[in-house]
UniProtKB/Swiss-Prot annotation:
Bias (Polar residues) ranges: 10-22
Protein source organism: Homo sapiens (Human)
Protein name: Nucleolar GTP-binding protein 2
InterPro entries per the UniProt record, alphabetical: G_CP_dom, GNL2_CP_dom, GTP-bd, GTP-bd_ortho_bundle_sf, NOG2_N_dom, P-loop_NTPase, TRAFAC_YlqF/YawG_RiboMat
Entry's family note: Belongs to the TRAFAC class YlqF/YawG GTPase family. NOG2 subfamily.
Residue positions where Phosphoserine is found in the record: S504
Subunit and partners: Interacts with LYAR and RPL23A. Interacts with the nuclear importin-beta receptor and, at a lower extent, with importin-alpha.
The keyword GTP-binding appears for this protein: yes
Gene this chain is encoded by: GNL2
Span list, region Disordered: 1-33, 481-502, 555-594, 630-731
Residue(s) carrying N-acetylmethionine: M1
Biased composition range(s): Acidic residues: 555-589
Amino acid sequence: MVKPKYKGRSTINPSKASTNPDRVQGAGGQNMRDRATIRRLNMYRQKERRNSRGKIIKPLQYQSTVASGTVARVEPNIKWFGNTRVIKQSSLQKFQEEMDTVMKDPYKVVMKQSKLPMSLLHDRIRPHNLKVHILDTESFETTFGPKSQRKRPNLFASDMQSLIENAEMSTESYDQGKDRDLVTEDTGVRNEAQEEIYKKGQSKRIWGELYKVIDSSDVVVQVLDARDPMGTRSPHIETYLKKEKPWKHLIFVLNKCDLVPTWATKRWVAVLSQDYPTLAFHASLTNPFGKGAFIQLLRQFGKLHTDKKQISVGFIGYPNVGKSSVINTLRSKKVCNVAPIAGETKVWQYITLMRRIFLIDCPGVVYPSEDSETDIVLKGVVQVEKIKSPEDHIGAVLERAKPEYISKTYKIDSWENAEDFLEKLAFRTGKLLKGGEPDLQTVGKMVLNDWQRGRIPFFVKPPNAEPLVAPQLLPSSSLEVVPEAAQNNPGEEVTETAGEGSESIIKEETEENSHCDANTEMQQILTRVRQNFGKINVVPQFSGDDLVPVEVSDLEEELESFSDEEEEEQEQQRDDAEESSSEPEEENVGNDTKAVIKALDEKIAKYQKFLDKAKAKKFSAVRISKGLSEKIFAKPEEQRKTLEEDVDDRAPSKKGKKRKAQREEEQEHSNKAPRALTSKERRRAVRQQRPKKVGVRYYETHNVKNRNRNKKKTNDSEGQKHKRKKFRQKQ
């Protein structure tokens, strides 16, 4: 029998392996490997063919075909003979120091990090060395002395003074209650597990949403509550972004600044600006604050990332701080669901702000901390309706808020404790149970709701917020000791005073110096804040220590900003006037003086209005309701108008003559030939004359169902009647 010939690749391979491109498609044969993918995978797996002697018969596709022993040609280039890339130790040290300062400055951005030797900077920062035994890894002989192998020892203190300071700081920050390494006796007492409602914002799902937002955003905005900015910060997220995502920009937005005095907002912005760029913001669709500055900042970030088609801005923070409200304010309409309770936003949401800027809303996230249940409730993390015993947290509310504010809000003069306060409030509001007993639970929920929604005036004072204390006089005993010593020993210098008195004097002087240094530092920080906080409408009525008078520097800054805005508006008006004006210059010569006088009067009125506002802010401890103020200021104006009318009726005075002369001049100007209208004005007049309703002209000329019996006769209607008469005559 003859052996059949080899037919080659014309036959179909019947195997069902995944490497066979001709295999039969099964039930799930939609996502099978195609022929190109199979060839690529075979290329990865294949081996060169060798004979029995080990010589390559068939090389791989990517292997060189040059025979062994041939001399390869090197490309002629001058770089082979030039110096290699080297750097001096001094210049490297200078680069590291300058880069450190730039990286720590929150208002500076390194544009092209790929072209800089960033590894030289990052290699020095080794936080994991804290837990490593340095003597085991690097002995003293290899680090110091003639046999040292390191140019720079790996130490966390440069000298003894810094080492002592580090030790003192660690001892001051040590808390025995938080030390888990201490051996304690087991007394059998166990802390009760927290309820699930106090763990809101800590679930795995919400943290997954947070990491989704962080990964997909170029700029991360952390929204803080202006009443307690440090309490609503998330240090864990900040350290995570600094270590794991250093290329992402983090900024702070201080929301709800309408619930805090303006001086406190300004100081908090100055304090937080040392870490990250900070903006004060008031989320409102009708009367927002900081919206223009925020959008301008986002545009600057968009210009930084010119290589990207668009940038995404993620909003993160504690629950109920106003993340969704900030997004609605930026869009000027409701695009996110908002509510004064925590947990309204469930999942992340993409919103388009502009063509190149997208906003991402994120649910509120809480990092597990050692806050008590009361702290968690007062931060607004928990919904008040779900708290089983709200009356337990009222004591903290009464401690944090001033008694005068609480008595003003609830019209209760005095109380002994939290329970007494709730009972009085229940009787006053009528929240009673059967038998006339006060409903403490309902009243407690009312108070907590008022606290979370800002109806009770409260805010955490910024650091160094205490006013300057006048230097106190020295005690009389210490002052009297000095002359006695001088009389007894006139030839010797007085070096000692009464023991305790001298120590107290030195302590007071050091305290005053430190206080002055802190105040000077705060003043330097405050000068960097550029926002005009005078435009914030503060809702709560503060008094006493919470009201700080407006400083002269603040007034000057606000006046400068006001004058800058006025100049910008005037420049815009000039540009518009130059573009729109088409009149000859000869006609405008007479009106120039009047226009200048009018502009100056308007400017004076605006400055007067601004100064009145500043005075009102300075003496804002005395507040008058809006209706009462309108009545008070309306009466003098009416009296002034009536007096002017009486004067005009009695006799023509000098002022009356001037008014008559002005009226005559105006009549003369009006009698002159009217100026030619521009095309824009003519089109506007035509549009105003046109009827806005559809079909109005039809009813004017036609009688439809006797709607218009007194119809106007037109040429068309007369022609139609004439035709009808002719037709009847023919018949």
